[in-house]
From Swiss-Prot:
Binding locations of NAD(+): 72-73, 77, 145-146, 175, 186-191, 210
Protein name per UniProt: NAD kinase
Name of the encoding gene: nadK
Lineage, top ranks: Bacteria, Pseudomonadati, Bacteroidota, Bacteroidia, Bacteroidales
Protein localization: Cytoplasm
Family: Belongs to the NAD kinase family.
Length: 290
């Protein structure tokens, strides 16, 4: 099998996990392609002598499977690079939460064995696409988790006129607005009171950030509907964050958000159940009285 490997470049203390991964793949005779930035980190900063059959930059690669070793941020970066290639991504967690990258280092050897035995499942995760006339945002307009519209200064709110399929929904007076996929519903959106959505749901969550009204609540819509946003701000600009990567926009910029025409394929072990992950990693439903 041919693997393309992405990793974070700041967790030097956890370098042993990366070394273990390369040894496991070598043991199986894998063809290993490594993101050049990650390879440089392993060789120069960590002094690891790892096998790499090829190095690649950006999205200039092909493989049977992508492996992301790091946290959920590394997984999102890998997903952005994979784009519409249709290559499944396996996430190995050396970060903190590990919701997308949910294979622990202790499970790594067993998981690689399962990959070679074709004993795993692949989940299709929907992606959001942002359409606008801002060339900087169009460099990478796709989000696996969320697209967030946020105020740029620390004092005043922004007004976000929101329409669904051309029909007026409301004008949010808030610090921002988060448009999230089911995958992203357990990320930024959840932290501001958004709903938890099962990953396979064909929906999009719209969640305001610190709204200036008790009557404004999150809303869930069909994922084949189109969202149009017009923003007003005292500073005459605002931030757009696509899976955490932000750009400043002029308030004259109209944003259109819709489901992308491709999905991200996520590799899951058969014993990794979404509801189990909610309970163990987010303590969902935990009762300290018991």
């Amino acid at each position: 099998m041919k693997f393309a490997i992405f990793g974070n470049t700041y967790q030097a203390k956890k370098s042993s996990h990366a070394a273990t991964l390369f040894k496991l793949l070598e043991k199986h005779g894998a063809e290993i392609c490594v993101c050049r930035e990650f390879h440089r980190f392993l060789k120069s900063d960590l002094k690891l002598n790892v096998k790499a059959d090829d190095l690649f930059d950006e999205n200039n690669f092909d493989a049977d499977m992508v492996i992301s070793i790091g946290g959920d941020g590394t997984f999102l970066k890998a997903a952005r690079r994979v784009g519409n290639k249709g290559i499944p991504i396996l996430g190995i967690n050396t970060g903190r939460l590990g919701f997308l990258a949910d294979v622990s280092p202790e499970e790594m050897e067993e998981t690689i064995e399962e990959v070679y035995q074709n004993h795993y499942t692949v989940e299709e995760r929907s992606v959001l696409q942002l359409l606008c006339d801002d060339k900087h945002l169009q460099n990478s307009p796709y989000a696996l988790n969320e697209i967030a519209i946020l105020k740029r200064d620390s004092s005043s709110m922004i007004s976000i006129r929101t329409a669904i399929n051309g029909a007026h929904l409301t004008t949010y007076q808030a610090d921002g607005l988060i448009i999230a996929t089911p995958t992203g519903s357990t990320a930024y959106s959840l932290s501001v009171g958004g709903p938890i959505i099962v990953p396979h749901s064909k929906t999009i969550a719209i969640t305001p950030v610190a709204p200036h009204s008790l009557n404004v609540r999150p809303i869930v819509i069909c994922d084949d509907w189109e969202i149009t946003l017009d923003v007003e701000s005292r500073s005459h600009n605002f931030l757009v964050a696509i899976d955490g990567s932000s750009e400043t926009c002029k308030e004259t910029t109209r944003l259109t958000i819709r489901r992308a025409d491709y999905s991200i394929k996520v590799v899951k072990r058969f014993n990794h159940i979404f509801f189990d992950t909610l309970r163990t990693k987010m303590m969902w439903g935990a009762d300290s009285r018991v």
